[in-house]
Amino acid sequence: MNFSGGGRQEAAGSRGRRAPRPREQDRDVQLSKALSYALRHGALKLGLPMGADGFVPLGTLLQLPQFRGFSAEDVQRVVDTNRKQRFALQLGDPSTGLLIRANQGHSLQVPKLELMPLETPQALPPMLVHGTFWKHWPSILLKGLSCQGRTHIHLAPGLPGDPGIISGMRSHCEIAVFIDGPLALADGIPFFRSANGVILTPGNTDGFLLPKYFKEALQLRPTRKPLSLAGDEETECQSSPKHSSRERRRIQQ
């Protein structure tokens, strides 16, 4: 088995692998969630030695109780078949062996994470979009987008289902917010591209991307339609029909 691949190569690696069986898929989801927590948020609490680039020794990781029953082969399969390319594997030196990291999404500080600075308007993708949900929309209109405890705000270079879009937005998001990247860049807001193609920004000094950088918004579900950035349409919370009209008015306030 070849452990030299990483998240950036998984699309090619997965084509030559059989599709996981249903029970195997359940285990893979469990493993993926455990990896996400350990590599993005919990490394220090779990006592994992994380390098400045976000990599940790896979052998040390697999010794943790939550990873008992999983093998290096299981991890390789999850890395290879993860559609959003969340993880990367690489060979370390003989003393550490195989290393693994999350490509983005950290709440931990990872000073040497492999991020490409996007320093000019020409370097930015033509589209920068953040996916969110109705329950967050009133606050976003008022305060802007927030890092929410992570080191970056996540943006996608397209909408779910667009060609070549693998990560950056959950597929079940209800609202898409389109960002004026050149305007934010001109105001000193930095942007980066992660190893799996997600566009990241820390926002301003308070960790926010303010509403003045919103170009437009689009309702994604149940049908696509433009939304007012003034917040003057009825917030129907379409995916949550249990909300009463009184509750919807309260959400709008």
UniProtKB/Swiss-Prot annotation:
Residues 1-29, 225-253 are annotated as: Disordered. SUPFAM superfamilies: ADP-ribosylation. The keyword Phosphoprotein applies. Residues 243-253 have a biased composition (Basic residues). It is an enzyme of class 2 (transferase). One of its GO terms (biological process) is tRNA splicing, via endonucleolytic cleavage and ligation. It catalyses: 2'-phospho-[ligated tRNA] + NAD(+) = mature tRNA + ADP-alpha-D-ribose 1'',2''-cyclic phosphate + nicotinamide. Widely expressed. Weakly or not expressed in lung, spleen, small intestine and peripheral blood leukocytes. Its EC number is 2.7.1.160. The modification N-acetylmethionine is found at residue 1. One of its GO terms (molecular function) is tRNA 2'-phosphotransferase activity. The keyword tRNA processing applies. Keywords: Acetylation, NAD, Phosphoprotein, Transferase, tRNA processing. Signal peptide: none annotated. The modification Phosphoserine is found at residue 240. Pfam families: PTS_2-RNA. InterPro entries: Ptrans_KptA/Tpt1, RNA_2'-PTrans_C, RNA_2'-PTrans_N. Belongs to the KptA/TPT1 family. Catalyzes the last step of tRNA splicing, the transfer of the splice junction 2'-phosphate from ligated tRNA to NAD to produce ADP-ribose 1''-2'' cyclic phosphate. This is tRNA 2'-phosphotransferase 1. It comes from Homo sapiens. The gene is TRPT1.
